[in-house]
């Protein structure tokens, strides 16, 4: 890929390069995996599945909730140490913003209660102490009406302060709903304007943003440096199904070429519960790896 391959031959070029895709870099950037990709199988054999991810060459890990609670049945330190032993870096952790409301058909009856930012922000942050995690990510939060968006701002602002005090960075992960008008406003715009950038960054899901008709590059330009993380997610024609990264219609090269504007540091492949997660990650590594 052509990112960070920008030769700085003069001070003028250097001064302007912040707003241009960088095009020269010394080594490929590490690829990561959002473990929700393996939600259906990970808990059955955590060490074995994490070994498979490492064997594919992935280096960064982003965790999410699991069926068995904790960090895939482990303490945070145990999970952090497991990643280290496999040569991987546990970078970030996903949590929900408010009490979890499963979608229809998603059985959570046998799952333990999930902590959320509204009620448990301090406990969540405390649980990550001593691990390699640098980012705490709000995976979703109710934004169905103006009142919910207002409450979301309050929750995220408070959580951002708690995260910062512990040396963590709070990010918000989007779906497509954040870019829809709700009572005359878009939740993404409200979060951007009403929550200071030092309290909230964004993990832009490139697939969902594209599905919403949003140009990620324009988002980067509007808020340079506010997107340290991204989800590399792909869709088929018509956005009916999520497909392995790089095999669908999202123009990842164009987006990733502009990642220096975004301030992007970590890139996580995500494919929501595919039939064969390892196969999807294998395809994603092959397709996206050359772009990094």
Task: Kindly give the residue locations of the regions a language model identified.
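Alpha-helical scaffolding within the catalytic cores
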Residues: 46-48, 74-79, 119-124, 185-189, ...
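Aromatic-rich peripheral "rim/lid" segments of glycoside hydrolase catalytic domains that contact
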Residues: 273-292
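Acidic/histidine-rich catalytic cores of soluble enzymes
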Residues: 60-62, 163-249
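Active-site acidic/histidine proton-transfer and metal-coordination neighborhood
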Residues: 10-12, 16, 21, 101-201
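Hydrophobic faces of well-ordered beta-strands that scaffold small-molecule active sites
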Residues: 31-34, 61-63, 90-95, 136-138, ...
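N-terminal pre-domain/capping segments
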Residues: 2-134, 164, 225, 286-292
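Acidic-and-aromatic substrate-binding clefts and catalytic sites of carbohydrate-active enzymes
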Residues: 38-44, 64-75, 98-102, 113-117, ...
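H/E-rich (His + Asp/Glu) clusters that bind or coordinate divalent metals
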Residues: 245-269
């Amino acid at each position: 890929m052509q990112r960070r391959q920008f030769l700085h031959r003069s001070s003028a070029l250097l001064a302007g390069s912040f707003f241009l895709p960088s095009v020269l870099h010394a080594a490929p950037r590490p690829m990561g995996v959002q473990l929700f990709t393996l939600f259906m199988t990970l808990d059955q054999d955590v060490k074995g599945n994490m070994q498979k991810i490492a064997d594919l060459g992935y280096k960064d890990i982003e965790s999410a909730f699991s069926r068995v609670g904790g960090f895939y049945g482990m303490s945070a330190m145990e999970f952090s140490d497991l990643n280290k032993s496999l040569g991987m870096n546990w970078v970030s952790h996903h949590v929900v913003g408010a009490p979890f409301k499963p979608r229809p058909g998603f059985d959570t009856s046998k799952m333990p209660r999930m902590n959320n930012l509204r009620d448990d922000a301090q406990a969540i942050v405390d649980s990550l102490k001593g691990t390699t995690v640098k980012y705490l990510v709000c995976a979703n939060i109710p934004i169905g009406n103006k009142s919910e968006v207002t409450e979301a701002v309050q929750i995220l602002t408070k959580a951002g302060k708690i995260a910062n005090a512990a040396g963590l960075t709070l990010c918000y992960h989007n779906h497509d709903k954040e870019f829809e008008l709700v009572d005359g406003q878009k939740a993404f715009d409200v979060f951007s304007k009403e929550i200071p950038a030092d309290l909230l960054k964004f993990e832009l899901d490139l697939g969902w943003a594209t599905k919403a008709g949003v140009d990620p590059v324009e988002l980067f330009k509007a808020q340079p440096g506010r997107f340290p993380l991204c989800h590399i997610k792909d869709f088929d024609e018509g956005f009916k199904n999520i497909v392995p990264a790089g095999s669908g219609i999202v123009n990842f090269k164009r987006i990733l070429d502009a990642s220096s504007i975004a301030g992007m540091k970590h890139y996580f492949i995500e494919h929501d519960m595919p039939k064969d997660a390892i196969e999807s990650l294998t395809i994603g590594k092959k397709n996206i790896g050359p772009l990094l």
